[in-house]
Amino acid sequence: MIMSLPQCSHLRLSILAATAAMLMVITTAQIGGQVIQVELWCVAKNNAEDSSLQTAIEWACGQGGADCGPIQQGGPCNDPTDVQKMASFVFNNYYLKNGEEDEACNFNNNAALTSLNPSQGTCKYPSSKGANNGRLADDTSMGAGQADMSRGGRPISSSWMVTFIGFGSLLTMTWIIHHL
């Protein structure tokens, strides 16, 4: 399909207007200091060895002070056939109790943060949204629905990220306009 000159110009103007509007929103967010809140969970990595995970569980439940009751026999997260699942619950508990610091979700590089809720069946993982300075709230969110932006959470937006996204969008739109 070949566009006539007026159609092409109209498309370019539409793209420029959309880009300008997007950059205004990004700039407003950056200047306004708005922070995006996201629910996060600390979970065991898929490629972690079971023996490494078991060692990490033992440390976290002992010296680390994590609440390991739910992974004990009869607990809702106990599954001796799935060490990764049990490690994920313990890692997440430790992470929340330690103020959601990045270092609290490492376990010798066997853990990572995710925004996907790992809860399964009766095994419910509290999220970063329900944590309050390292203490889990009584009404801990289980992350079943949309994130509640009015309470705690982990800020993931910073001015450099917003600037990076805006600049990348501007470059992309400039390339598209140039190649029409």
Curated annotation (Swiss-Prot):
GO terms for molecular function: (1->3)-beta-D-glucan binding; polysaccharide binding. One of its GO terms (cellular component) is side of membrane. It is a lipid-anchor; GPI-anchor. A lipid is attached at residue 157 (GPI-anchor amidated serine). It is found in: Cell membrane; Cell junction, Plasmodesma. Disulfide bonds join 42-105. Keywords: Cell junction, Cell membrane, Disulfide bond, Glycoprotein, GPI-anchor, Lipoprotein, Membrane, Signal. Contains two additional disulfide bonds. Residues 1-29 form the signal peptide. It holds the Pfam family X8. Residues 158-180 form a propeptide. Residues 126-151 are annotated as: Disordered. PANTHER family: BETA-1,3 GLUCANASE (PTHR31044), PLASMODESMATA CALLOSE-BINDING PROTEIN 5 (PTHR31044:SF33). This is PLASMODESMATA CALLOSE-BINDING PROTEIN 5. The gene is PDCB5.
